Regions:
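Alpha-amylase-like alpha-glycosidases and glucanotransferases acting on alpha-linked glucans and related
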Residues: 2-250, 254-255, 270-271, 276-285
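Structured C-terminal cap/extension of enzyme domains
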Residues: 258-311
C-alpha cells in the first residue's frame, strides 16, 4: 500500500514520493471521517520522468518468490486521495495516475512470474475500473457484507456475484465475523469517535442489513429457523460463499478459530492497537500458526468449505 514516511524506502525514493502530503481515502459508509494512512504517495510526474523504474522494481520484488499477491487499495493506481499534512482526511483531493502504465506493469510482472494478482477494488470506485482490471487479467475483491443490490440494498444472490474475484465474508478492515455479528464494528467506531451519526441509528441500520442476510441464508436452507449462534451463522455464510461463481474463496484465520477481536481499525493510528492483536480462540487462548492446523473448529469449517466447493 505504501511505506513509512521515516523508513528506508521513503529516504531512498524521496525523489519520486510527494512530501507535505499523505495518502488516504475520502469519507464513505464505513469510515465516515475518511482515512489518513500517514504514507507519502507516489508523484505521478516523477514516476513518468523515471520510466516507472521504482514502481517496476517494487512489483518485481514482491512477485519474485510469490505465486500470488493481493494489492491493497489497487484503485489508488488510478487515482489517490492526497491529504495536506496536518489536515483532516475531509480536506483531501484526488490526484490522477497513469493507470495504463501502472496496471500494465503489474500485469506484465505477474505474467513473467506466473502469478495471480488480486486487487482490493473496494471503497469509492469509479464504475469502469472493475471492468478495466478484469480486462487486464486481474481479479477483484468481493466482501459478503458489501455485496448488496444497488437499488434495493438486499443481499446479492450467490449466482450474481462476480466470477473473477476473491470472495470472503470479512476483510482486515472489519472485525472477524463473530465480532461483526455482535455489532463490535459499530461500538468500536463509536468509542473512538469515528461516527458522524448517533450510534443508535448506526446499530439499527446494521441490524437490518445483518437480518437481511440471515433471512437469505434461511431462504436457501443454509441456516435453520431458530439457529442464530455465531458458529452456526459463520458456517452458513461460508457455505453461501462457496456457492458463488468466484474463482477464489478466502477463509479468514480469525473466523476459522472463532476469534472476534478487531485486527485493524481504519482511520486510527495510536487510538487502537492495529496489527498487534494476537490470534486467539473464543476463550482467549492465544494460538500459534501451528495450532490452527490442529484446531477442531478450523478443521470443521474447512471441511464444510471443501464439501461445498467440490460438490
Amino acid at each position: 500500500m505504501g511505506v513509512h514516511p521515516d523508513g528506508a524506502d521513503a529516504w531512498a525514493l524521496q525523489d519520486v514520493l510527494a512530501r507535505g502530503v499523505t495518502a488516504g481515502a475520502p469519507p464513505d459508509e464505513y469510515n465516515q471521517l475518511g482515512q489518513d494512512w500517514s504514507q507519502p504517495p507516489w508523484r505521478p510526474d516523477q514516476l513518468e520522468a523515471g520510466e516507472y523504474l521504482p514502481f517496476r522494481a517494487l512489483i518485481g520484488a514482491v512477485l519474485r518468490h510469490a505465486g500470488g499477491v493481493r494489492i491493497d487499495h489497487i484503485i489508488g493506481l488510478f487515482r489517490l486521495w492526497w491529504i495536506p499534512e496536518g489536515a483532516p482526511p475531509t480536506a483531501g483531493t484526488y490526484v490522477r495516475y497513469n493507470h495504463e502504465a501502472m496496471i500494465g506493469i503489474v500485469a506484465l510482472e505477474a505474467h513473467r512470474a506466473g502469478a495471480v494478482v488480486v486487487g482490493e477494488d473496494l471503497g469509492t470506485v469509479e464504475p469502469w475500473v472493475r471492468d478495466y482490471l478484469r480486462e487486464r487479467g486481474l481479479l477483484g475483491t468481493s466482501i459478503l457484507w458489501f455485496e448488496r443490490d444497488e437499488y434495493t440494498r438486499a443481499p446479492r444472490p450467490a449466482e450474481r456475484w462476480r466470477e473473477y474475484c476473491l470472495s470472503s465474508v470479512a476483510t482486515h478492515d472489519l472485525p472477524p465475523t463473530a465480532g461483526y455479528l455482535a455489532g463490535d464494528h459499530v461500538r468500536l467506531r463509536d468509542s473512538l469517535g469515528l461516527l458522524t451519526r448517533p450510534v443508535a441509528d448506526e446499530m439499527a441500520d446494521d441490524d437490518r442489513e445483518k437480518g437481511a442476510w440471515l433471512a437469505e441464508l434461511r431462504r436457501l436452507g443454509l441456516l435453520a429457523e431458530g439457529e442464530q449462534g455465531s458458529e452456526q451463522v459463520i458456517t452458513a455464510l461460508y457455505r453461501f460463499l462457496a456457492r458463488t461463481p468466484s474463482r477464489l474463496v478466502a477463509l479468514a484465520l480469525t473466523d476459522a478459530v472463532g476469534d472476534r477481536r478487531t485486527q485493524n481499525q481504519p482511520g486510527t493510528t495510536d487510538e487502537y492497537p492495529n496489527w498487534r492483536v494476537p490470534l486467539a480462540d473464543p476463550d482467549g487462548r492465544l494460538l500459534l500458526l501451528e495450532d490452527v492446523f490442529t484446531d477442531a473448529r478450523a478443521a470443521a469449517l474447512c471441511e464444510v468449505l471443501r464439501a461445498e466447493l467440490t460438490g
